[in-house]
Amino acid sequence: MNTDIEELFVNKYIVKQKRERILFELRKPSKRIDALSRFCHNYDTYLDERKIVKRGKKITDKELKEIVEKYGNKNKGFMICWDKRYDLMEMTADTAISIIRNDGMCALFISGDVCIISTEQIQGPKEIVILCSVY
């Protein structure tokens, strides 16, 4: 398991007072879902507001792709998600965006200085949050 990705995500985008708990949960298999659940509905409690570039339900795939191209790591990155088939996998931005759009649960894509988080889908489109550590 690549815990460097989790540590990078936590240190860049989580508020300082919540980092230790989130990292503990992400690293412990029996608690991993607890950590991901925190981003389903009340992500604003955990994310560093200063790093949020954009959030909403109407963010297009094109916008997501453009921000990854501008601030990401050569169009590749890592997923952190509920679906174990993709969790901690390296993949292209296109593949990650497809997973973010089509999976009903929370998913995070980290690429370079950008992170895209999709919340749990309840009704209508999912909420998408774009974070950037150098914006």
Would you name each region that the model predicts?
Residues 1-124, 132-135:
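Structured alpha/beta or helical-core interaction and ligand-binding surfaces enriched in interleaved
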